[in-house]
């Protein structure tokens, strides 16, 4: 995975197809996944991570090699790895959390406790 994580053919969709092709091959024993990304789309990150988890469920080892940087979604897609290798100068860290606040004004008939 090189660059910002995006959806679409040039982004996560293409990477997912490559991972799927590897884990659907019965001769595959391991997937070495190179990450050089500051992150990006949470949906794209989740798609790639899910595909790596599918490979792990098939007893395929997942090995991540981090390049110049692996942050946010780049770290998140690395979490299924059995092994993670990084360069001494790799900048890595911070899995961000998305938050969508709920609108409870429209909830009728609910009993609310006050704190």
Regions from the language model: what does each represent?
Residues 1-60, 69-115:
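Small-residue-centered hinge/linker elements
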């Amino acid at each position: 995975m090189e660059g910002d994580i995006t959806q679409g053919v040039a982004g996560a969709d293409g990477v997912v197809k490559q991972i799927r092709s590897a884990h659907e091959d019965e001769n595959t024993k391991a997937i070495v996944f190179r990450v050089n990304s500051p992150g990006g789309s949470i949906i794209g990150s989740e798609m790639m991570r899910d595909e790596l988890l599918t490979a792990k469920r098939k007893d395929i080892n997942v090995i991540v090699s981090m390049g110049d940087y692996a942050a946010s979604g780049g770290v998140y897609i690395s979490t299924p790895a059995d092994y993670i290798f990084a360069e001494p100068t790799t900048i890595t860290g911070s899995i961000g959390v998305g938050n969508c606040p709920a609108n409870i004004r429209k909830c009728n008939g609910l009993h609310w406790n006050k704190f």
